[in-house]
Amino acid sequence: ADTVALLKKLRFNYLAMPAADAAGITAIKDYLEKARKSLDAFGKAIFYKPDTEADSQRIIELDGCENLKLNFTGTEESYTGAEYTCRIAGILAGLSDTISATYTKLDEIVSCDILEDPDAAADAGHLIPLFKNGEYKLGRAVNSLTTLTDGVTADFQKIRIVSTLDLIAEDIVTTFRDSYVGKYVND
């Protein structure tokens, strides 16, 4: 509850909470989905292998980062997958809306246990690192959405699509609230 109360006061695009427990993840997911529906917030959260499948456009489930060794400063150090969610949040927040995160280089990874079936992981709504052509890269940039409907197609599983839609919606809502509401007569 304290986390959600704090989130209501912040404006963010991507949130990483390495220490979040199952109840916290559920509370954050519920808040993000409700806030998006009411056009109050447009954020997304990244978690490492949450206990329950989120099945949400708002949640990115990082997976496949066991025995992770990273080198950020010239020294190799061990990190948990949960700690690495912060780096992924930074990557996603820093990308242009014209670029997908798929195959983004992860130069800091020295070694990592890679999942054997990256397509199955992506189809299950998991964002994973890959090792291709001698380099670590992000796999298919997907969120945790797996349940598709007539109005929610496979396009909504792509991080870039959801982020672009959120950017457009947030710009429209912000412009309306800041430049029109209370400034013009409604006849």
Where are these regions (language model features)?
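A glycine- and small-residue-enriched flexible loop/hinge signal that marks low-structured segments
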Residues: 4-184
